[in-house]
Amino acid sequence: MSRKIYIYDTTLRDGAQGEGISFSSADKIRIAERLDNFGVHYIEGGWPGSNPKDMEFFTEAAKRKFKSAKVAAFGSTRRANTKCKDDPQIDMLVKANTPVVTLVGKTWSLHVREVIRTTPEENVAMIGDSVRFFKEHGKEVVYDAEHFFDGYKDDPRYALATLQAAQDSGADIVVLCDTNGGTMPGEVSRITAEVVTQMKCAVGIHTHNDSGVGVANALAAIEAGAVQVQGTINGYGERTGNCNMTSVIPCLVLKMGYDCISKENVARLRDLSMFVDDLANVRHDIRQPFVGATAFAHKGGIHVNAIEKVARSYEHIEPETVGNHRRVLVSELSGRSNILMKAHELGMDLSKDTPEVRDILQQLKQLENAGYEYEAADASFHILVQKLLRKHKPFFKPLTYYVTAAGLWHGMTPGLGSSSSSSSSSDENRIEATVDIEVGGQNVHTKEAGDGPVNALDKALRAALLNFYPAIANVQLIDYKVRILDGASGTAAKTRVIIESTDGTDTWGTVGVDANIIEASWEALVDSVEYKLFQDEKRK
């Protein structure tokens, strides 16, 4: 029977300490509930007393019954030369009313002498007293040995003495922390194995990614005998982040065979990763192992030809086992297999014998040479293929468009100082777009104002189509990227625009290229609307 490994998630505390990461108390509750449903064993909610949000979280968490997870409150050992009952921080941990208390204490003599400035003996007493205090209050106690690996390399006898103090006072588990993230996997493996042989209580691991080996260090510690791994979803955390749970969990379950999270739940890993990113308002890392959009994306023609025959020839696991899916990219590097698999992915019926496949491949290479890129523009690729197969049925015909801008001068007039104007502020920087299209046998003319030329064009085009295709009202432009393709040409440089759109259910990308950024944007907008209408027609 495989060894049981416990997942201790600290996204809500250590993860929230990452730059640009902030959760409301409501966000924390939603994430905690999602982690519990996923099967996480421990959820560290925060540091009681450090901020109002954390106490709000603990108050709300106490009202809920979690299925698989125990909620932990995080805090420090008592202050030097202070009794636990007189330490306000200790009191806040009691008031958090959690079944688990996680105490962090000093292990490295450098920190004892130079940071908290007490004696080695008093530090050991601080650890023992604090653990004992919470055990007497009926708590499960996790002891986090801060900077353990640095402390052990500097003075192994003292580092072990701090662990011994926690164990002898009743700690349920001692967790070895690579707080600075500078220890290598070989060192972690050796030191963890040495600690495991000398401790009677369980041993855990907490790593950081400063050297890029946070996940490797966690796995090395598990193989050396640790039974709990601490980390964060998507690797959020101080500096370069903590051990990434979205990498550790599938490694433990799918590759190493540990009893950890059920395979059924691991198949929802990507959804969990995306959910946490959404609440943190962080753009998803497409290159993240296992759960990133490119984790199972194939571009080279040889690769695609191989996976078409045997998927595992270029995939280390089945994408679906972590809730991901295979993607085939089309580019100037594509071969016939790329085109066929991408067409199949987009619901188009192509075979190796389809004579137009060669034409599609040739046209694709020419367009990419001209600056087009279809990796993030599947919808434009779909329309391109339909046109080359002579199956494209346009839903409308663009005729003309105009964009006008009216603004006030707010600069300096030579010899006259700062300029001024009596015009109303509502007229400043006014952008209007006029669109003429042919739709349903009619010529339609619309004019709309917007926050910029692309926004104005988008609004005008949709206004022109709305009476004919009401579903257009649901379409929103959610991302807009511009890239200058030839910076040496200055203002005459060709521009590539990639637009991402959604109707609330599906999301799709389109591309446009032109020396005129507005024309490039218009091309991408037209493709976006065409694709939406095509998909709606197909569903009927």
Task: Enumerate the language-model features and the residues they cover.
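Mixed-charge, glycine-accented linear interaction segment located at domain edges/termini
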Residues: D506-K540
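Short beta-alpha connecting loops at secondary-structure transitions
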Residues: L176, G231-E238, V253-S262, V322-L329, ...
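Small-residue-enriched alpha-helical segments and adjacent helix-cap loops
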Residues: R268, E432, G440-A473, I478-L485
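A mid-to-C-terminal "edge-of-domain" accessory segment
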Residues: K4-I5, T11, P250, M256-G440, ...
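Alpha/beta enzyme core
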Residues: I5-I7, R13-I43, F58-F66, R79-V203, ...
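Short, ordered loop/turn segments at secondary-structure junctions
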Residues: L12, W47-P48, G75-R78, G105-W108, ...
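Flexible glycine/proline-rich, aromatic-decorated loop/lid segments
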Residues: V213-V229, Y236-C251, T294-E318, K494-I498
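Generic long, charged, amphipathic alpha-helical segments
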Residues: Y469-T502, V511, R539
